Structure formats: structure tokens, C-alpha cells
Swiss-Prot record:
Annotated binding of a ubiquinone, by residue: H201
Family membership: Belongs to the cytochrome b family.
Source species of the chain: Ochotona koslowi (Koslov's pika)
Pfam families: Cytochrom_B_C (PF00032), Cytochrome_B (PF00033)
Superkingdom per UniProt: Eukaryota
Cofactors: heme b
Matching Gene3D superfamilies: Cytochrome Bc1 Complex, Chain C
Protein name: Cytochrome b
Mode of membrane association: Multi-pass membrane protein
Function field: Component of the ubiquinol-cytochrome c reductase complex (complex III or cytochrome b-c1 complex) that is part of the mitochondrial respiratory chain. The b-c1 complex mediates electron transfer from ubiquinol to cytochrome c. Contributes to the generation of a proton gradient across the mitochondrial membrane that is then used for ATP synthesis.
One GO cellular component term: mitochondrial inner membrane
């Protein structure tokens, strides 16, 4: 009798994705982040669902409903902090996952890569709207500043902002719709993840060498199921350590003050995972230019396959490209630091230089270094 997992229509899908999937024999821990992102998404949906049971999306009660969750709901505090810090874990895994894709040339699977970029934008939008929901000072002013950027769009900008706000300022209508979108988007993300995996399984996984590995494949189960399970254990340990020992480490103290439209906080800044993009936005003195740079800072990933000039796929055997890649990482860390600093000397010029180098590295230096490495291959 044939095994049920190979015949049953539903089990067959699971079998081909998680059990009998042929996987390269040499993929390293950098390939764990896909499954870790799946775990993060699961944690966020489950904790978010339980939070939504007690949360009220009204300007008068939103802040106190979050306080109520933390104080009165059974284990509400851990659910709330798992959700808040789970978002940070989500973005850590996302950045490492994208970084892996750039380093090992995974972007040559263009459909998988493009769906990934779409996922990144969607997750960023979801996180932004989620940050508005507790209705603290930084929630309110963050929402005001970021939505206001749309007014830079010529002709329709002002109308568009008022349409998104549902009025003439960030108010009850804005909070209610943000809650609605924040609730629905994770399910759209889940659907996109399935499409992402569908395209990935069309080609099979890349590997550190960047060489086609069809001749040397191993079954996903048990080799990579156990490896993923170990990754899950590490991620959950890290998340629980953060939640139980310093849950507010990555948050902003201003968000423990209820939203007040009459009092602007001294430094308006987003959560840490948006600081690099925020620094790029602020480095351009023109509003529309800043908005375009902000969008391009992520959208530039779509140009990666076009900018690939090397004869080798992976950076594993390309020391010049490796050096530039790590300079890019250092540049992004610099931008993250600058995004959290006040707009004054010397931070302004550091931010402008770091923003310039971010685009210069990706658009000019990395493709050029690849061409030089191609020449060196002939020596």
C-alpha cells in the first residue's frame, strides 16, 4: 500500500514542501531564516489574535485597553511583550534573510526575490500600523509624520493624506482603519509567503557555492527538519530572554505617555528596524526627494538581478565583493544609529554621507568590483 502522505491531496502538498523535498546537502545556518520567519509570523498572528480580543481601537480607550491587557488579563503582559518584541525578531530575521540573498546571489531566482521584496514592504507597512495602535505619544506622532510624507506627492498629495486620515488630522478614524489593516495584512502576508515558497520550489534552493546542486540532493526530512527545529529553539530562547528580562529594551519610553496632539515629543523616531530608512529620508533636504529616497532604499533590491555582472553567482569566492558587502552592512548599521540621533551637527553630514554610500555601493561599486573579479579569473 502506498504511503498516505504520497497519495492524499493535502498531505501530498505538505510532503513535497517539507518531507520529500530535495534540498542541497551543503546549505548553512544562513538558510534557517526562512523557516524562522515562518515561526515569527505564526507567533505574531497568534499573540496578535489574543491581543485583539481585549484591545479597543478608539482614541479614548486604546491606551487604557493596552494597560488593561498588561495588568488585568491573565498572562496579558507576556502576550503583549511577545507581540512587541516578536516584531523585532521578525525584522532581525528579515534583514539576515535578505542579506543572505544578496551575499549568495539568491536574487537570480527573480520571481522568488520579487515576491520577497513585496513581502518586505507589506511587513514594514504592517509593523508601522501596529506601532500606532497603543496610542502613545510616539504612536500618534509617528503616524502623523509618516502619513504626512504622502503630501509630498504632487497635485494629489494633500487630498490623499486627508483621505488616509479620514479627517484633517490623525484621529479616531485613522486609528480604527489602522487596526483593521493591521489585522488583515498578516493573512495577506501568509498568502504571499505561500506564493514565495511556490516559486522557490520551482527552482529549488540555492547553496553557499552558488553552483547547481542537482547531482547532490538530500531529503528535507530528517536533515533540515531537525536543523530548523534547532533554529526554532534558539529563536524562542532569545525572544523569551528579551521578553522576560528587558521587554522595553527596544521600545521608546515616550510611548508610555498617552497620545497628546498638543504636545510634540522632542525627538520623533520610529522603531529601531526603520531607523536606517528614516535616516535616508532625513538626509535629503527636499520633502519629495526624501520620500523617493525612502522608497528606493528598499525598492533598490529589485535592481539586484540587473546589477549582477559577475560570472559567479555567490560571493563565496569573490573577496573584493565580500569586502564591499560588509562595508554595506557597516553602512546600514551607521544609518540605523544616525536615524536615532537628533538632526544636528555632526549627525546630519554623517547621515548624508552614509545615505550616499548606501546607493553608491549598490549601484556603482559592487557591479564594478564584479567586473574586475571577472578579469582576475583570467589571470
Amino acid at each position: 500500500m502506498t504511503n498516505i502522505r504520497k497519495t492524499h491531496p493535502l498531505m501530498k502538498i505538505i510532503n513535497h514542501s517539507l518531507i520529500d523535498l530535495p534540498a542541497p546537502s551543503n546549505i548553512s545556518a544562513w538558510w534557517n531564516f526562512g523557516s524562522l520567519l515562518g515561526l515569527c509570523l505564526g507567533i505574531q498572528i497568534i499573540t496578535g489574535l489574543f491581543l485583539a480580543m481585549h484591545y479597543t481601537s478608539d482614541t479614548l480607550t486604546a491606551f487604557s485597553s493596552v494597560t488593561h491587557i498588561c495588568r488585568d488579563v491573565n498572562y496579558g503582559w507576556i502576550i503583549r511583550y511577545m507581540h512587541a518584541n516578536g516584531a523585532s525578531m521578525f525584522f532581525i530575521c528579515l534583514f539576515l534573510h535578505v542579506g543572505r540573498g544578496i551575499y549568495y546571489g539568491s536574487y537570480t531566482y527573480s520571481e522568488t526575490w520579487n515576491i520577497g521584496i513585496l513581502l518586505l514592504f507589506t511587513v514594514m507597512a504592517t509593523a508601522f500600523m501596529g506601532y500606532v495602535l497603543p496610542w502613545g505619544q510616539m504612536s500618534f506622532w509617528g503616524a502623523t509624520v509618516i502619513t504626512n510624507l504622502l503630501s509630498a506627492i504632487p497635485y494629489i498629495g494633500t487630498d490623499l493624506v486627508q483621505w488616509i486620515w479620514g479627517g484633517f488630522s490623525v484621529d479616531k478614524a485613522t486609528l480604527t482603519r489602522f487596526f483593521a489593516f493591521h489585522f488583515i495584512l498578516p493573512f495577506i502576508i501568509t498568502a504571499l509567503v505561500m506564493v514565495h515558497l511556490l516559486f522557490l520550489h520551482e527552482t529549488g534552493s540555492n547553496n553557499p557555492t552558488g553552483i547547481i546542486s542537482d547531482a547532490d540532493k538530500i531529503p528535507f526530512h530528517p536533515y533540515y527538519t531537525i536543523k530548523d527545529a534547532f533554529g526554532f529553539l534558539l529563536l524562542i530562547s532569545l525572544l523569551l530572554t528579551l521578553v522576560l528580562f528587558s521587554p522595553d529594551l527596544l521600545g521608546d519610553p515616550d510611548n508610555y505617555t498617552p497620545a497628546n496632539p498638543l504636545n510634540t515629543p522632542p525627538h520623533i523616531k520610529p522603531e529601531w528596524y526603520f531607523l536606517f530608512a528614516y535616516a535616508i529620508l532625513r538626509s535629503i533636504p527636499n520633502k519629495l526627494g526624501g520620500v523617493l529616497a525612502l522608497i528606493l532604499s528598499i525598492a533598490i533590491l529589485a535592481a539586484m538581478p540587473l546589477l549582477h555582472t559577475s560570472k559567479q553567482r555567490s560571493m563565496m569566492f569573490r573577496p573584493i565583493s565580500q569586502t564591499l558587502f560588509w562595508i554595506l552592512v557597516a553602512d546600514l548599521l551607521t544609518l540605523t544609529w544616525i536615524g536615532g540621533q537628533p538632526v544636528e551637527h555632526p549627525f546630519i553630514i554623517i547621515g548624508q554621507l552614509a545615505s550616499f554610500f548606501y546607493f553608491f555601493l549598490i549601484l556603482i561599486l559592487m557591479p564594478t568590483s564584479s567586473l574586475i573579479e571577472n578579469k582576475l579569473l583570467k589571470w
